[in-house]
């Protein structure tokens, strides 16, 4: 049984955020130098430890990566070391199995400049790249718009296609060729990788040139080099579309109970989507199958040792039984240390006795009583992380204008109706606040539950017009009735009233109910609202205060579980609802007229409201696209401001509200489809999300602190001096004298392997096989080039000695040719 040796334990840093990498060499873990992080050999296996800082704690991910040409023994050792490292971390890590070519986005995200897969491995003498070494000849196929994966391919035009980016790496020169159908982001990622190779692997001693496939005529010297090295070019292959995963597949969840009775894996289906946390019992192990795309194994803290230690094996056996591809991703989750990705596959994930620090949306029936803190706008912008958690840009004391949708147009709401929201109406509310001398805007779009579809559509349309009037600066916040965020409530200072239906417009012919019942929630002027409920005794709740308005009087009913602050706020909002004298009624001492107004006594909720466990919320960022006619969201892990690209739109999900960020160069269709895109995201979310979750539309350059607070070290000036693609291209290759470099590369004196390199090229004399095999330089016949022994063989002897024809041998990568020559005694 392999074990973490003392050297590994001694060098293992488990307190500093970042990554550490080991390669499996002779069944031992050997550290990989940090200067070569992101470079992997396909003949090897690796173990990667990633440490993340989350608030005041650290979280751990352990990945073992399997190269396609690695041995079974190496794969087994990597898996065992991963389990043992998790044990060393006391079960606090999430384990991941990564297979070459099907790496998880989490794994790729660690290597911001790109993941490079090289041919060879430790068994063939391949070492991780040494800085300043220019003895390299390879062609890298660069894939990916976000997290780049670059793999070595045959050095020939046959490897190219019109849609991707390729790096021809000749040691002292790197030529980046951009397919004519590749996009700007793919080209920029390729340039970043080329720059990384130049600066990190070559110590800055390599020239980099860029060729745009649609304008090859602009780079004649670079094209001459490429044609010399790669041979004559035929018609290029068409672009290869990136594989996409349908949202429906991600949402196809099945939970299985796993037991290992009598040495046999027994799997029993427990549930399908929607999944709830209470399905997971601490005494058991489970497999969660996400549509065959990824397999999660959950290990209960009280499960038996054999089942816990065999979790990864159970997953691999499950994959075989289901006939899923061997490259299927696997994550092993420890009870109590689950990853955010795993948690959000469930409808709700809570952790007892943990404070999340996130305010909750106030809704009828289930409302978290969160104490709001009063902040001014300047403080919120200086401390955006507080603004993000409290969902407050300021204390609500800015200027406000309110319009109602009437006949599909905007009509200002009279001052006496400010703070009154009717379920039959839609409203636009423009809030203006100052940071220094600069004005900032929030545009709330409030949509009543009984408003017509035409009015709802008109509210969205009018919001666009109002947004344009203010130069696209307002942050748009869509609010469905009952989901009012804290900041909206703070604007009305404890006097916000939401009616079930009806309207406040003039000439309204609908009869106004003579008796109305309102449930009041809130503890101060910044978080209180009264929400109309059905005027029946069954609507009461012992934990709250209710206002009962009748033709003759107004009752203030105080449940036994309400607080003094709640009673005081109810008195304040009651003055907004009724000007008559308020009669305070204590639960259990109601007069007969009170019950008569409600249609008689009836049972109602009177059990003590339990202390709500705080839901674990981890913000998640997604790049969104609907260009293919269907919605696609690609998650960005360990995100920061640099991940927000000007050409794209992004979705920031903080669970009880969703931000939609629009880059200034995003296409118009994606801008228009903001609300639809977020709705589609919520519909296809595996956790069965609330479709009425507030949606906040944010434009680049006008981000509120409630958005920027989710990003570490947000720079408001980041986009003020951005360079164009042409500027970056010129900057990358502005030091190259291409004429001189072309002469050097194409000179016969320079040993550059090309697609036309022939084993029979040059006037080399032929010798019998026995005079060349296993001979030292001193024992070779006169006239033999020691570095090209195989080229002195006849075609027949060559095929017999090396097991292949000269043409087949010449098509192999250089490293593989060298290995074969060593094996056959011709090195």
UniProtKB/Swiss-Prot annotation:
<dbReference type="GO" id="GO:2000392">
    <property type="term" value="P:regulation of lamellipodium morphogenesis"/>
</dbReference>
<dbReference type="GO" id="GO:0051693">
    <property type="term" value="P:actin filament capping"/>
</dbReference>
<keyword id="KW-0963">Cytoplasm</keyword>
<dbReference type="GO" id="GO:0001951">
    <property type="term" value="P:intestinal D-glucose absorption"/>
</dbReference>
<feature type="repeat" description="Gelsolin-like 1">
    <location>
        <begin position="27"/>
        <end position="76"/>
    </location>
</feature>
<dbReference type="GO" id="GO:0005903">
    <property type="term" value="C:brush border"/>
</dbReference>
<dbReference type="GO" id="GO:1902896">
    <property type="term" value="P:terminal web assembly"/>
</dbReference>
<dbReference type="GO" id="GO:0009617">
    <property type="term" value="P:response to bacterium"/>
</dbReference>
<dbReference type="GO" id="GO:0030042">
    <property type="term" value="P:actin filament depolymerization"/>
</dbReference>
<dbReference type="GO" id="GO:0010634">
    <property type="term" value="P:positive regulation of epithelial cell migration"/>
</dbReference>
<keyword id="KW-0106">Calcium</keyword>
<feature type="repeat" description="Gelsolin-like 6">
    <location>
        <begin position="631"/>
        <end position="672"/>
    </location>
</feature>
<keyword id="KW-0597">Phosphoprotein</keyword>
<feature type="repeat" description="Gelsolin-like 4">
    <location>
        <begin position="407"/>
        <end position="457"/>
    </location>
</feature>
<feature type="domain" description="HP">
    <location>
        <begin position="761"/>
        <end position="827"/>
    </location>
</feature>
<dbReference type="GO" id="GO:0008360">
    <property type="term" value="P:regulation of cell shape"/>
</dbReference>
<dbReference type="GO" id="GO:0051016">
    <property type="term" value="P:barbed-end actin filament capping"/>
</dbReference>
<dbReference type="GO" id="GO:0032233">
    <property type="term" value="P:positive regulation of actin filament bundle assembly"/>
</dbReference>
<comment type="similarity">
    <text>Belongs to the villin/gelsolin family.</text>
</comment>
<feature type="modified residue" description="Phosphoserine">
    <location>
        <position position="735"/>
    </location>
</feature>
<dbReference type="GO" id="GO:0071364">
    <property type="term" value="P:cellular response to epidermal growth factor stimulus"/>
</dbReference>
<dbReference type="GO" id="GO:0032433">
    <property type="term" value="C:filopodium tip"/>
</dbReference>
<dbReference type="GO" id="GO:0030175">
    <property type="term" value="C:filopodium"/>
</dbReference>
<dbReference type="GO" id="GO:0032532">
    <property type="term" value="P:regulation of microvillus length"/>
</dbReference>
<dbReference type="GO" id="GO:0005902">
    <property type="term" value="C:microvillus"/>
</dbReference>
<feature type="region of interest" description="LPA/PIP2-binding site 3">
    <location>
        <begin position="816"/>
        <end position="824"/>
    </location>
</feature>
<dbReference type="InterPro" id="IPR007123">
    <property type="entry name" value="Gelsolin-like_dom"/>
</dbReference>
<protein>
    <recommendedName>
        <fullName>Villin-1</fullName>
    </recommendedName>
</protein>
<dbReference type="GO" id="GO:2000394">
    <property type="term" value="P:positive regulation of lamellipodium morphogenesis"/>
</dbReference>
<dbReference type="GO" id="GO:0060327">
    <property type="term" value="P:cytoplasmic actin-based contraction involved in cell motility"/>
</dbReference>
<dbReference type="GO" id="GO:0030041">
    <property type="term" value="P:actin filament polymerization"/>
</dbReference>
<feature type="region of interest" description="Core">
    <location>
        <begin position="1"/>
        <end position="734"/>
    </location>
</feature>
<dbReference type="GO" id="GO:0051015">
    <property type="term" value="F:actin filament binding"/>
</dbReference>
<feature type="region of interest" description="Headpiece">
    <location>
        <begin position="735"/>
        <end position="827"/>
    </location>
</feature>
<dbReference type="InterPro" id="IPR007122">
    <property type="entry name" value="Villin/Gelsolin"/>
</dbReference>
<dbReference type="GO" id="GO:0005737">
    <property type="term" value="C:cytoplasm"/>
</dbReference>
<dbReference type="GO" id="GO:0040018">
    <property type="term" value="P:positive regulation of multicellular organism growth"/>
</dbReference>
<dbReference type="GO" id="GO:1903078">
    <property type="term" value="P:positive regulation of protein localization to plasma membrane"/>
</dbReference>
<keyword id="KW-0206">Cytoskeleton</keyword>
<keyword id="KW-0009">Actin-binding</keyword>
<dbReference type="GO" id="GO:0061041">
    <property type="term" value="P:regulation of wound healing"/>
</dbReference>
<feature type="modified residue" description="Phosphoserine">
    <location>
        <position position="366"/>
    </location>
</feature>
């Amino acid at each position: 049984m392999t074990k973490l040796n003392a050297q590994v334990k001694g060098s293992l840093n488990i307190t500093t955020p970042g990554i550490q990498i080991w390669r499996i060499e002779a069944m031992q873990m050997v550290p990989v130098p940090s200067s070569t992080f992101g470079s992997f050999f396909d003949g090897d296996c690796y173990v990667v430890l990633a440490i993340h800082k989350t608030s005041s704690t650290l979280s751990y991910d352990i990945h073992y990566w399997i190269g396609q040409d690695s041995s079974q023994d190496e794969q087994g050792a990597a898996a065992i070391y991963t389990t043992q490292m998790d044990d060393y971390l006391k079960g606090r890590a999430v384990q991941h199995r990564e297979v070459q070519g099907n790496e998880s986005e989490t794994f790729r995200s660690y290597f911001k400049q790109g993941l490079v897969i090289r041919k060879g491995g430790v068994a063939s003498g391949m070492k991780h790249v040494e800085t300043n070494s220019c003895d390299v000849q390879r062609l890298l196929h660069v894939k990916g718009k976000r997290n780049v994966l670059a793999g070595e391919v045959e050095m020939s035009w046959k490897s190219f296609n019109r849609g991707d980016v390729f790096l021809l790496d000749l040691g002292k020169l790197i030529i980046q060729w951009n397919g004519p159908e590749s996009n700007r982001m793919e080209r920029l990622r390729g340039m970043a990788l080329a720059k990384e190779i130049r600066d990190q692997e070559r110590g800055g001693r390599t020239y980099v040139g860029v060729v745009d496939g649609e304008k090859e005529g602009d780079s004649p010297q670079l094209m001459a080099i490429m044609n010399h090295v790669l041979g004559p070019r035929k018609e290029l292959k068409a672009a290869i579309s990136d594989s996409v995963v349908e949202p429906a597949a991600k949402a196809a969840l099945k939970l299985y109970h796993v037991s290992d009775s009598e040495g046999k894996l027994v799997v029993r289906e427990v549930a399908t989507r929607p999944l709830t946390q209470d399905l997971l019992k601490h005494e058991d192990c489970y497999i969660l199958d996400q549509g065959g795309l990824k397999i999660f194994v959950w290990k209960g803290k009280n499960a038996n040792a054999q089942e816990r230690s065999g979790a990864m094996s159970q997953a691999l056996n499950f994959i075989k039984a289901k006939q899923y591809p061997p490259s299927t991703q696997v994550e092993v989750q420890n009870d109590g240390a689950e990853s955010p990705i795993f948690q959000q596959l469930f409808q709700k994930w809570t952790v007892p006795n943990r404070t999340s620090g996130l305010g909750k949306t106030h809704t009828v029936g289930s409302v978290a009583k969160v104490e709001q803190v009063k902040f001014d706008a300047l403080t919120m912008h200086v401390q955006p992380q507080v603004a993000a958690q409290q969902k407050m840009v300021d204390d609500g004391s800015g200027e406000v204008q309110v319009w109602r949708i009437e006949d599909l147009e905007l009509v200002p709401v009279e001052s006496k109706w400010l703070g009154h929201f009717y379920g039959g109406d839609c409203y636009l509310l423009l809030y203006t606040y100052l940071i220094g001398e600069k004005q900032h805007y929030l545009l709330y779009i409030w949509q009543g539950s009984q408003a017509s579809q035409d009015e709802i559509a008109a509210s969205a349309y009018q919001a666009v017009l109002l947004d344009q009037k203010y130069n696209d600066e307002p942050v748009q916040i869509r609010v469905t009735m009952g989901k009012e965020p804290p900041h909206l409530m703070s604007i009305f200072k404890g006097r916000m009233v939401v009616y079930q239906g009806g309207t406040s417009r003039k000439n309204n012919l609908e009869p106004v109910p003579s008796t109305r019942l309102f449930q009041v929630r809130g503890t101060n002027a910044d978080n209180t609202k009264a929400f109309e409920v059905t005027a029946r005794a069954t609507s009461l709740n012992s934990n709250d205060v209710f206002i009962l308005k009748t033709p003759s009087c107004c009752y203030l009913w105080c449940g036994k579980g309400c607080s003094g602050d709640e009673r005081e706020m109810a008195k304040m909002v009651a003055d907004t609802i009724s000007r008559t004298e308020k009669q305070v009624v204590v639960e259990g001492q109601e007069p007969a007229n009170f019950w008569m107004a409600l249609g008689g006594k009836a049972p109602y909720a009177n059990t003590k409201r339990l202390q709500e466990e705080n839901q674990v919320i981890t913000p998640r960022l997604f790049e969104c696209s609907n260009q293919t006619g269907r919605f696609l969201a690609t998650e960005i892990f360990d995100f920061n401001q640099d991940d927000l690209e000007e050409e794209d739109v992004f979705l920031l999900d903080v669970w009880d509200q969703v931000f939609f960020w629009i880059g200034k160069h995003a296409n118009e269709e994606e801008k228009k489809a903001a609300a639809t895109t977020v709705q589609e995201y919520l519909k296809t979310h595996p956790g069965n999300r609330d479709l009425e979750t507030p949606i906040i539309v944010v434009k680049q350059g006008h981000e509120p602190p409630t958005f920027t607070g989710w990003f570490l070290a947000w720079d408001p000036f980041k986009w003020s001096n951005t360079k164009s693609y042409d500027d970056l291209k010129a900057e990358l290759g502005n030091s190259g004298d291409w004429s001189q470099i072309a002469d050097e590369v194409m000179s016969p004196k320079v040993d550059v392997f090309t697609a036309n390199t022939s084993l029979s090229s040059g006037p080399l004399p032929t010798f019998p096989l026995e005079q060349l095999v296993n001979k030292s330089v001193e024992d070779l016949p006169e006239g033999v080039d020691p570095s090209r022994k195989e080229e002195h063989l006849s075609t027949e002897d060559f095929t017999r000695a090396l097991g292949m024809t000269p043409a087949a041998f010449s098509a192999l990568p250089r490293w593989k040719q060298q290995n074969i020559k060593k094996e056959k005694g011709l090195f």
